[in-house]
């Protein structure tokens, strides 16, 4: 191969490698400026991405911004390959257009998913089944070919966020109802309408975990607002939301609601309650988050390490608890034996 062509080939390969590394750095690592501005920037990105996915109840991938033509040219380290750069610019432009179209469709499907979820929640509140034909009317015929994908995402959101499973009750008419996954269900329709009082609990515990095991009240409301749940506005499923999170779940010891120390004016925060610690774990919550994000727990490395430490501490605590129980039982038995012997006549 002539030397000039070899030089062009090497330059092109170098540009491609540089672009790939730059894009990886954009996605996986904060810049030096970002680190200086916020030492926990990577944790913040992780928290925001997971919270958004949790709120929408459907898997969402971090959106990668393709490198701009000017940035790619600046990193190319060549000044003579004008033809190659022109071709690269055309490819980049085509790639950006394709990405924009895909993102637009994804946003539209997300909106249709949220509309259908709200419709199904209304039907649930009214104790009415719905049909596939009605659901198609909600999303409009334009998105008919995407109905299977929308239906899957709707099912996932109602299941994960609201504790309601979408079940087909009549295959002939394609009729569906939302069934509580938390209440008793013996198969008849009346018990299927049981209100899932704690359906919001796992998402709330997840938000607290994502915020360093202690979430400010405004962070909780920000998350609830993304779900269409607002302070002072009665919700179709959960009723009065403030009462639910600051009284009901607190009285049931799933949540703790306390004033932030030294806050003036007073501000409040949420933590896991003792019952939440007893009935679930950070690993279970992380598995829930992973399911929402359609991934595995170890893809959240910082949270995964914390969850593993929590599992180890729990495993170490179990033998100590068992030992204490054994000691208590032995002491109690000894006391009973002593009491019995002392009561015998000499």
From Swiss-Prot:
<keyword id="KW-0963">Cytoplasm</keyword>
<dbReference type="GO" id="GO:0005634">
    <property type="term" value="C:nucleus"/>
</dbReference>
<protein>
    <recommendedName>
        <fullName>Melanoma-associated antigen B4</fullName>
    </recommendedName>
</protein>
<dbReference type="InterPro" id="IPR037445">
    <property type="entry name" value="MAGE"/>
</dbReference>
<keyword id="KW-0825">Tumor antigen</keyword>
<dbReference type="InterPro" id="IPR041898">
    <property type="entry name" value="MAGE_WH1"/>
</dbReference>
<dbReference type="Pfam" id="PF01454">
    <property type="entry name" value="MAGE"/>
</dbReference>
<feature type="compositionally biased region" description="Low complexity">
    <location>
        <begin position="92"/>
        <end position="101"/>
    </location>
</feature>
<feature type="compositionally biased region" description="Polar residues">
    <location>
        <begin position="45"/>
        <end position="54"/>
    </location>
</feature>
<dbReference type="InterPro" id="IPR021072">
    <property type="entry name" value="MAGE_N"/>
</dbReference>
<feature type="region of interest" description="Disordered">
    <location>
        <begin position="1"/>
        <end position="107"/>
    </location>
</feature>
<dbReference type="InterPro" id="IPR041899">
    <property type="entry name" value="MAGE_WH2"/>
</dbReference>
<dbReference type="GO" id="GO:0000122">
    <property type="term" value="P:negative regulation of transcription by RNA polymerase II"/>
</dbReference>
<dbReference type="GO" id="GO:0005737">
    <property type="term" value="C:cytoplasm"/>
</dbReference>
<feature type="compositionally biased region" description="Low complexity">
    <location>
        <begin position="318"/>
        <end position="346"/>
    </location>
</feature>
<feature type="compositionally biased region" description="Basic residues">
    <location>
        <begin position="1"/>
        <end position="18"/>
    </location>
</feature>
<dbReference type="InterPro" id="IPR002190">
    <property type="entry name" value="MHD_dom"/>
</dbReference>
<feature type="region of interest" description="Disordered">
    <location>
        <begin position="311"/>
        <end position="346"/>
    </location>
</feature>
<dbReference type="Pfam" id="PF12440">
    <property type="entry name" value="MAGE_N"/>
</dbReference>
<feature type="domain" description="MAGE">
    <location>
        <begin position="109"/>
        <end position="307"/>
    </location>
</feature>
């Amino acid at each position: 191969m002539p030397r000039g062509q070899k030089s062009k080939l090497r330059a092109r390969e170098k540009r491609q490698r540089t672009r790939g590394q730059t894009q990886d750095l954009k996605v996986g690592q904060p810049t030096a400026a970002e680190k200086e501005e916020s030492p926990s920037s990577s944790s913040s990105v992780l928290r925001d991405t997971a919270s958004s996915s949790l709120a929408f109840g459907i898997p969402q991938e971090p959106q990668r911004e393709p490198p701009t033509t000017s940035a790619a040219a600046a990193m190319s380290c060549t000044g003579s390959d004008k033809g190659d750069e022109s071709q690269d610019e055309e490819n980049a432009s085509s790639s950006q257009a394709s990405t924009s179209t895909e993102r637009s469709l994804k946003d539209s499907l997300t909106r249709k998913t949220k509309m259908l979820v709200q419709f199904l929640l209304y039907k649930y509140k009214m104790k009415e089944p719905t049909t596939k034909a009605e659901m198609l009317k909600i999303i409009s015929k334009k998105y008919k070919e995407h109905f299977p994908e929308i239906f899957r995402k709707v099912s996932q959101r109602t299941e994960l966020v609201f504790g309601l499973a979408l079940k087909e009750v009549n295959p002939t008419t394609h009729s569906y109802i939302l069934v509580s996954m938390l209440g008793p269900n013996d198969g008849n329709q009346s018990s299927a309408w049981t209100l899932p009082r704690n359906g919001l609990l796992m998402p709330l515990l997840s938000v607290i975990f994502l915020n360093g095991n202690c979430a400010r009240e405004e962070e909780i409301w920000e998350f609830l607002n993304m779900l269409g749940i607002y302070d002072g506005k009665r919700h179709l499923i959960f009723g009065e939301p403030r009462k639910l999170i600051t009284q009901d779940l607190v009285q049931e010891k799933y949540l703790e609601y306390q004033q932030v120390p030294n806050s003036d004016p007073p501000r409040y925060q949420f933590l896991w309650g003792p019952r939440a610690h007893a009935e679930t774990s950070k690993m279970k919550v992380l598995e829930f988050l992973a399911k929402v994000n359609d991934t595995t727990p170890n893809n959240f490395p910082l949270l995964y390490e914390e969850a593993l430490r929590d599992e180890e501490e729990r495993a170490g605590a179990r033998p100590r608890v068992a030992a204490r129980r054994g000691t208590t039982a032995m002491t109690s038995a000894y006391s009973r034996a002593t009491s019995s012997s002392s009561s015998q006549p000499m």
